[in-house]
Amino acid sequence: MPKIALRNPLDGFKKAVDQASARLQAEVFHGPIGRAVSETPKTGWVAKGIARLGLTAFKPAPPPPVLKRPVVMITGLTMEAASYDPMAKHLASNSANGKVAVYVVADGKFHDGGVNGKVLTDAQAAKTRMFQIQYTDVKGAPSDKEPQLERAFRAIQRATHAPALDVVAHSAGCTDFRLYLDRRPAADRSIGINEAVFIGPASHGTFMGNVGNAVGRPIGVEKAGTELEIGSPLVQHLNDGWAGQRNQVKGDVTILGISGAPTPGKGGVSNGDGFMPVNQLDMAHAHTIVLKGSDPTPVAHLMQVGYSGVIAEVQKRLAQ
């Protein structure tokens, strides 16, 4: 008798979740909501209202500087490379910075402007100073993504021949990057890191990781949740070894947080971005800046990479 392939009843659910996530990210970063809160200049009564309310997360982003070094943009859990498009678009408005190139780990190539853009040679990729990374699986755990970062950093250094790179990482992407610093081979330590900016990092784990560990299997984030949850062995290992990671960053490590949403964490619920409490971001020898937001939901954590106030703070660091 021929074998009958049985479908996993969860496959349809996972597909629906993935499609919903893609639609949400498209709206967040490219729809009217994303445009309203990102790099769009805030003028007139809008600027006055933002200033009066002290909503520093939405302060205007000044014209971008010329970037000092190539910038590597590392995404958070479930986030596509395009989540950095608002920031990249703003920085690219200074023509000296070039257009963004996306390193797609799955094919090991640079693509022009997006994951489906034309393939670039190393010489063509070297004309930009902005590099997004598209993981093979955006729901992967830090231990799965770290080897992919090794390949990406090698490729970017090979193309640019830059003595040092700057890094902007978001959410779990900060954990991915820290694990890269922790594990990268001695030969890769010649790839210098100058400035590092962490946006909404899970510095000491995140309660959302605990949730993912408990109920994340149907949507494929159980392993990531296990590694990112508060008190996980990976988080403890990285925090115990933070000094070694910090020493590999020649310049400053800047942590950006957003307030305005009730956020669960160690010790209960406090102020944060819905995922990360602002009182649990700090790390030794890093400078923490908290910007005031207005979204009382966890959507703030997803959207913050496109907030004009965040872009303003990031570009300050990239001009150092």
Task: Please state what every model-predicted region is.
Residues M1-K15:
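Short, compositionally biased, intrinsically disordered N-terminal export/targeting signals
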Residues G12, L24-Q320:
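Lipid deacylating catalytic domains
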